[in-house]
Amino acid sequence: MRTVGVEEEFLLVDADRSRPIPAASRALRVATEWGVAGGQVGAGALVHELQEQQLEIYTAPQVRMASLETELRAWRAAAAAAAAAVGARLVASATSPVAVEPHRVRSPRYDRMAERFGIVTDEQLTCGCHVHVAVGSTAEAVGVLDRIRVWLPALLALSANSPFWQGRDTGYASFRIQALGRWPLSGPTELFGTAAAYQELVERVLAAQVVLDQGMLYFDARASHRFPTVEIRVADVCLDVRDTVLIAALCRALVETSAARWAAGEAPPQVPAVLLRLATWHASRWGVSADLLDPMTARPLPAAEVVGRLVEHARPALRRSGDDGLVADGIARILEHGNGATWQRDVFAGSGRLDEVVSALALVTSGGA
């Protein structure tokens, strides 16, 4: 069975005022003293992200979703404890509900990004959930990328958890995706066809000397340049760990299904990237609270129907992994109660205060509610 690893990015907010604070370096020094910072390939870790108001965790590769959930909870607890030691709280929201002025982590790479991309780097404070699923070769990875691309907007809709930006309601379920769109390379991709074509594209992109390196291929899904995985990057960081595990289970099933179809010589869906951009924008705008676009036709359908088609497409793989029950329960929960964006807006409707939203987010992130 394919292994799965997850990266989650979080905000750091002041424990008293619920405002994002530049505390990552201090929290990581504490974590280093505790022996939980840094990390090696094949092991989980707590690390820096672009801004000082962020921390990132990543898990070791796991086979069982129960083990993945246990590790995610453990790393969230470790990150929350390190944050608390420096007067901060950990928040699982893909954007900051309250106004924030990001403070960039000082590193040569991030300094070069700031010099080249200006305000885009300065204002970039978003938190995603990236799922790594093992593949056997670059050829298989590209075959998978060509076949999962049509399903990624539905994953975004399920995970959407960023309705607020700089102190206002954006109207979007995932404004993180809109913010990411300011980078040169982000969002859906065209069909690649072969590993050679994928590699040629990467080489041409790097030769253009616009992005710094392969790490800046911010596609919704890509072949990882660090690990033998497909990295699915479309999802917002989820408030509820169970939703993170749901997204991970769906990602693995999509990769397994797509790899099998690639191996059998089945052609990928011939959907132009422009239609996938429409579907992604629509999922970003509405999440699961309205229609989604049909993956094959780009016609609007009820969100539950599109998500149901995703599950049906991946059902044999879900059954083989034993994740079908987990996925059914998770999707039913989100369709009934909403995603993280719904939850944030419900809290704001009850309190009228965005700092109360942040405080409530921190409580749930730390497992207190």
From Swiss-Prot:
What's its catalytic activity? Answer: L-cysteine + L-glutamate + ATP = gamma-L-glutamyl-L-cysteine + ADP + phosphate + H(+)
Name the keywords, alphabetized: ATP-binding, Ligase, Nucleotide-binding
InterPro entries per record: GCL_type2/YbdK_subfam (IPR050141), GCS2 (IPR006336), Gln_synth/guanido_kin_cat_dom (IPR014746), YbdK (IPR011793)
Assigned protein family: Belongs to the glutamate--cysteine ligase type 2 family. YbdK subfamily.
Checking HAMAP family in the record gives: Glu_cys_ligase_2
Q: Which Gene3D superfamilies match?
A: 3.30.590.20
Q: Which organism is it from?
A: Nocardioides sp. (strain ATCC BAA-499 / JS614)
Q: What is this protein's name? A: Putative glutamate--cysteine ligase 2-2
Give the highest taxon in the source lineage.
Answer: Bacteria
What EC number(s) would the UniProt record show?
A: 6.3.2.2
Functionally, this protein is described as follows: ATP-dependent carboxylate-amine ligase which exhibits weak glutamate--cysteine ligase activity.
